[in-house]
Amino acid sequence: MAASVTVIGIDPGSQCTGWGIVREASGVLTLVDCGAIRPKGGDFAARLGDLYRQLADVVRAHTPDEAAVEDVHAAQNVATALKLGQARGVVVAACAAHGVPVIDYRPSVIKKALVGTGRAEKEQVGYMVGQVLGVRPDWKLDTGDALAAAICHLNQRRLTRLAGLA
């Protein structure tokens, strides 16, 4: 078993992608860094390229062991779902290009792991992230969701170890 593990949680979006780095060492979770990427560029393809570059910079800077990525949920319309799926593909590609394994989690699974219900509001998730990490949540909602994904994954890893499955 590794002495510590570092996970990047990512909440993909075409307008804003939240990310958060959480490290677990000896059962203690620590916030390393977090932020939000607002891609720049004239057209959608340029924004996707900027998202890739910015996220790749984060991955290179923090060298996470694994990535927990929020899966695409149902969007209000097909065009929105397609754009979200493309942004998510860019996120997965940026991680894979740097050798970081990607684990997907449905939003309801992440919410249930942090709040106890899969229908929790973003504010509730952000509050619980702050409680778990022992910090005051002063980040964007997308960043809180990304940190929640990282915490959810670290909890899943711990449960797998305790069950003797890893």
From Swiss-Prot:
Signal peptide: none
Classification via InterPro entries: RNaseH-like_sf, RNaseH_sf, X-over_junc_endoDNase_RuvC
Cellular component terms per the entry's GO annotation: cytoplasm; Holliday junction resolvase complex
GO terms, biological process: DNA recombination; DNA repair
Active site (record annotation): 11, 70, 142
Keywords assigned: Cytoplasm, DNA damage, DNA recombination, DNA repair, DNA-binding, Endonuclease, Hydrolase, Magnesium, Metal-binding, Nuclease
Cofactor note: Binds 2 Mg(2+) ion per subunit.
Protein origin, superkingdom: Bacteria
Pfam families reported for this sequence: RuvC
Residues that coordinate or bind Mg(2+) 1: 11, 142
Single GO term (MF): DNA binding
Gene3D superfamilies: Ribonuclease H-like superfamily/Ribonuclease H (3.30.420.10)
Localization: Cytoplasm
Predominant place of localization: cytoplasm
Ligand binding (Mg(2+) 2): 70
Family the UniProt entry places it in: Belongs to the RuvC family.
Reported function: The RuvA-RuvB-RuvC complex processes Holliday junction (HJ) DNA during genetic recombination and DNA repair. Endonuclease that resolves HJ intermediates. Cleaves cruciform DNA by making single-stranded nicks across the HJ at symmetrical positions within the homologous arms, yielding a 5'-phosphate and a 3'-hydroxyl group; requires a central core of homology in the junction. The consensus cleavage sequence is 5'-(A/T)TT(C/G)-3'. Cleavage occurs on the 3'-side of the TT dinucleotide at the point of strand exchange.
HAMAP family: RuvC
Protein name, UniProt field: Crossover junction endodeoxyribonuclease RuvC
Record lineage: Bacteria, Pseudomonadati, Thermodesulfobacteriota, Desulfovibrionia, Desulfovibrionales
Encoding gene per record: ruvC
